[in-house]
Amino acid sequence: MKLLLSNDDGVHAPGLSALADELKNIAEIRVIAPDRDHSGASNSLTLTRPLILQKTSQGFFAVDGTPTDCVHMGLSEMFGYDAERVVSGINSHANLGDDVLYSGTVAAAMEGRFLAQPAIAVSLVNRGQENYATAAKVVANLLLRQLKSPIAPRTVLNVNVPDVPLEDIRGIQLTRLGHRLKGGEPHEIVDPRGRKRYWIAAAGEGDDAGPGTDFYPVEHNYVSITPIHVDMTRYDAFNQLQDWLGETE
């Protein structure tokens, strides 16, 4: 099994190192990640300048671009590595519900959708304990399970792991994406030169977050797994829109 690893927290993030340390025991790995934190980068590509690729002291590859840039390059013939699947993470915070629209972690995994094997995006629902080893063990177990029982290609498994020791994990639950409330207003600050600057507010609290959603299990020390893909079509709106379009003819 040949894995391409990436993330959005940056090439030096502890979650990426923990993931690489665990997965190298069960697979051949290659790591390519942004040279700095690109949280919230979503599926953006760098198209207005060339990218720089450097090798770190750990043997990882660092790119001065987005998570999607990294996986795009890592899967290219130029990179010379015939990866079978992409694993992205371990993100330092949750990627639940609407978070997947903004997440560079999920985007990096999604860029691996063209491979025959499903990609994995893994996040630690941080409670300040930094149990990255727990999340890494969960991913290793999922990969070994998929070898025995493959699932549909062009699928991304969005995995959220409670920030607890492995022995406190109660199990795994299959979930759908929940929803968050809208985030707060941008926070205004003034820099030392008197200029106004703004911080984007944190994500909103869970709204549709009950049983069956990805929010619920992690609050009860279960791992949440949500299968996602790129088709964002709202199929249940077809009939209403068809009626509306018919009225305009």
Curated annotation (Swiss-Prot):
Top EC category: hydrolase
Organism: Hahella chejuensis (strain KCTC 2396)
GO cellular component: cytoplasm
Cofactor(s) needed: a divalent metal cation
Signal peptide: none
Principal cellular location given in the protein's record: cytoplasm
SUPFAM superfamilies per UniProt: SurE-like
Binding site for a divalent metal cation: 8-9, 39, 91
EC numbers for this chain: 3.1.3.5
Family (UniProt): Belongs to the SurE nucleotidase family.
Protein name: 5'-nucleotidase SurE
Summary of the function given for this chain in its UniProt record: Nucleotidase that shows phosphatase activity on nucleoside 5'-monophosphates.
HAMAP family per UniProt: SurE
Pfam family, one: SurE
Cofactor note: Binds 1 divalent metal cation per subunit.
Keywords, comma-separated and alphabetical: Cytoplasm, Hydrolase, Metal-binding, Nucleotide-binding
Source taxon at top rank: Bacteria
Location of this chain's protein in the cell: Cytoplasm
GO MF terms, alphabetically ordered: 3'-nucleotidase activity; 5'-nucleotidase activity; exopolyphosphatase activity; metal ion binding; nucleotide binding
Catalysed reaction, written as an equation: a ribonucleoside 5'-phosphate + H2O = a ribonucleoside + phosphate
